[in-house]
Amino acid sequence: MLRPSEQWNWIYCSTKDRLLLDISDEAQFCSPFTSSQLACKPTQQPLSMAEAQAFWQIDDSLQQLEMPAAVRLELCLTALCAHYLQQQAHKSWYFQQGADCSAKPFELVMLRGLSGQYALVLSSETDCVTCLLLGDISTLSGKQLKRLQVIRVLRNRISPLKLDIPFRHTA
């Protein structure tokens, strides 16, 4: 797994119309976010210490789910991009009422429409949370929301994640 570095830089690429993270001369992460979704378009914005710390918190949360390291890395880097996204209206009507949980940033939660899906809380307000969808989900209206989409919902639409944690993770 890659380790965050002060050498990493956020940039907006107009050719690709994407937010990118320059990792090295040979590696670059291309986010799924276009200019219309961004609040600002960075040029050589170094990765901050807070972002590096968030990277490790996100990775730690995602380790609760069984997934390959490459997928976990993609989710970590995509979640870090949320800092550059525009604020959005909530999409609570797409989801069933949940348990009104008090999830904090970087915790995993469950959203339920016609299907259920894991989501990573990116930011938290008194009555809303902004989440990154970890997989596709079918909403109550039948609309498909795609993996890696960032959505904002009322807290009463999320439920805490309940996983059976293997004994090796509890010692």
Give a label for each model feature.
Residues 1-105, 110-116, 138-143, 147, ...:
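Mixed-charge, low-complexity intrinsically disordered regions
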Residues 24, 134, 156:
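Surface loops and adjacent helix of pleckstrin homology
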Residues 116-132, 136:
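Short beta-strand-centered aromatic/proline hotspots
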Residues 148-163:
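Structured surface patches comprising rigid loops and adjacent beta-strands/short helices at the edges
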